[in-house]
A protein has these predicted regions:
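Structural helix-boundary/capping segments
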Residues: 47-100
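Serine-dependent amide/ester hydrolase catalytic core
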Residues: 1-48, 98-99
Length: 100
């Protein structure tokens, strides 16, 4: 990544917002997908490759559900990744507890 002048890759943590408890399927367009598979889809590659990645909260949907931001760094850049995440988190909306 450093050869390309990139410190980190920024991506969504998941392709969907946090699902409601017990939501086994999620509709995207005209298709239904297993919610669990969707939740793993975007963070599985870095995990399987052993590449440092971190997910931080980055906002909320209009329904108040949390949305995550994934940061991915080169295999030797875990300290840099943590510094980027720390700075990025200060720029995000403050976390709030959901009403139960």
């Amino acid at each position: 990544m450093a050869d390309a002048g990139v410190d980190a890759i920024v991506a969504p943590t998941t392709p969907i917002a946090a699902p409601l408890l017990g939501e086994e399927n999620t509709r995207i367009g005209k298709e239904n997908y297993p919610t669990r598979a969707l939740l793993l889809r975007l963070n599985r590659p870095a995990n399987l490759a052993g590449i440092p990645a971190i997910s931080i909260p980055c906002g909320f949907t209009s329904a108040g559900l949390p949305v995550g931001l994934q940061l991915i760094a080169a295999i030797t850049d875990e300290p840099l990744l943590l510094r980027i995440a720390q700075v990025a988190q200060t720029l995000m909306p403050k976390a709030r507890r959901p009403q139960v």
